[in-house]
């Protein structure tokens, strides 16, 4: 496998539910601390919003090297849980 394919960034769509309101959650997502945590894993948030049918369902699109989203969640799971993120509702899909 060539290096260029291994280092290629992929787009990942993640959806999940939150217990708080979107306005509260987005303040955390847009914070400097979240930016630093994302940058540690070379994750670039491209979009964050909520479902028009369910304002507690969040949809995020990120760009990162393959596998980095999973590494981010493993390294930051307690921090993420503290922001009322329901891991049991998380769905993820990726494209290269």
PLM regions and their residue ranges:
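Short S/T/G/P-rich N-terminal loop/turn motif that feeds into the first structured element of a domain
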Residues: 1-96
């Amino acid at each position: 496998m060539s290096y260029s394919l291994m280092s290629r960034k992929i787009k990942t769509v993640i959806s999940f539910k939150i217990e708080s309101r979107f306005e509260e959650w987005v303040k955390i997502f847009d914070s400097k601390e979240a930016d630093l945590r994302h940058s540690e894993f070379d994750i670039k948030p491209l979009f964050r919003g909520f479902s028009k049918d369910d304002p507690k369902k969040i949809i995020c699109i990120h760009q990162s090297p393959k596998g980095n989203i999973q590494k981010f969640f493993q390294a930051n799971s307690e921090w993420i849980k503290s922001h009322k993120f329901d891991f049991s509702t998380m769905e993820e899909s990726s494209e290269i």
